[in-house]
């Protein structure tokens, strides 16, 4: 009897082993923003749609708020394959793709519609192609929105109002040069360290889009918000290119289709919620200044454009300007 049972058991085991295991890919998606930010909203939409449309063959695990490292570490992780998908400010990619710095130049995009037209069109896709040689596939350009200045000294009406301020800046050369030109003292700090730096007075001021001010609660340690809108801040959603190519053609299409939808929805929410967030900041005691001399700022920062052109040539800047007309 034991021999019979063993034979039956072996036959059953062989039969089960002949059935292929359900193929499942698990993707790690990382970003640096808090869970209250629209980057998390976008990531959640991406996760839900990918898992539903793939029939469960692709799972997405989200790691917000820098859980897998700061922006530089996340980008390195995505290139090496430790992280599958990362969302980060486009400025964080300019070391790898200097041309992307053209999109970061102050006052490059007078409107969101123009920014979307350029980023989603031939010019943006030309830059997107440059991500592939560094191991990344660009899935889309979500947004942080227009950058504005907060500080504790007073409203910023003209470039002169920034003179002497200890100004936190990101790693964008254009923004570093801009604030140095107008007399501020730019200091690079990771965004994760910024709240404490503002609270303790290590820096006096910073610039971020409204959504980031709200998400990171900078209004708790900053009194004044001036709507300078001095630079449009795009994000880049990237995927390890080998991981993407390792999926089936159908799965790759699901990834790219859903990413495009997620970017569009995130942009729509970003615009729709901006005034609501400004009102929220005012209600919490922040003084909001809308009286900004944009023309004076544009004149003051012209050398930033010239510096970029000296280093990278004028073809991309000229193409953007021509497409803007």
Give residue ranges: language-model regions.
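Bacterial N-terminal signal peptides that target proteins for export
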Residues: 1-9
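Cleavable N-terminal signal peptides
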Residues: 10-11, 21
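Sec/Tat signal peptide C-region and signal peptidase I cleavage site
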Residues: 17-23
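N-terminal secretory/targeting leader peptides
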Residues: 24-114, 122-125, 129-325
């Amino acid at each position: 009897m034991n021999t019979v049972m063993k034979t039956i058991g072996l036959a059953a085991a062989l039969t089960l082993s002949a059935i292929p295991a359900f193929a499942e890919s698990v993707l790690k998606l990382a970003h640096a923003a808090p869970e209250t930010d629209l980057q998390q909203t976008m990531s959640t939409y991406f996760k839900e749609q990918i898992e539903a449309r793939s029939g469960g063959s692709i799972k997405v695990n989200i790691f917000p708020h820098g859980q897998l490292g700061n922006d530089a570490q996340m980008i390195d992780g995505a290139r090496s394959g430790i992280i599958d998908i990362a969302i980060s400010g486009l400025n964080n990619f300019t070391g790898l793709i200097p041309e992307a710095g053209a999109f970061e130049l102050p006052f490059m995009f007078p409107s969101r519609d123009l920014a979307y037209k350029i980023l989603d069109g031939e010019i943006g896709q030309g830059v997107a192609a440059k991500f592939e040689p560094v191991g990344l596939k660009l899935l889309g350009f979500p947004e942080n929105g227009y950058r504005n200045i907060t500080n504790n000294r007073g409203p910023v009406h003209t470039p002169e109002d920034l003179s002497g301020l200890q100004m936190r800046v990101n790693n964008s050369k254009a923004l570093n040069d801009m604030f140095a030109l107008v007399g501020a003292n730019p200091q690079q700090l990771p965004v994760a360290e910024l709240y404490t730096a503002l609270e303790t007075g290590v820096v006096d001021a910073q610039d971020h889009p409204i959504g980031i001010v709200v998400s990171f609660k900078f209004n708790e340690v900053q009194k004044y918000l001036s709507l300078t809108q001095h630079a449009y801040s795009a994000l880049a959603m990237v995927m390890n290119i080998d991981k993407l190519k390792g999926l089936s053609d159908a799965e790759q299409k699901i990834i790219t289709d859903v990413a495009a939808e997620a970017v569009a929805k995130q942009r729509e929410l970003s615009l729709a919620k901006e005034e609501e967030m400004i009102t929220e900041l005012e209600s919490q005691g922040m003084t909001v200044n809308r009286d900004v001399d944009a023309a004076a700022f544009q004149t003051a920062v012209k050398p930033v454009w010239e510096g970029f052109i000296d280093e990278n040539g004028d073809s991309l800047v000229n193409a953007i300007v021509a497409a803007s007309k």
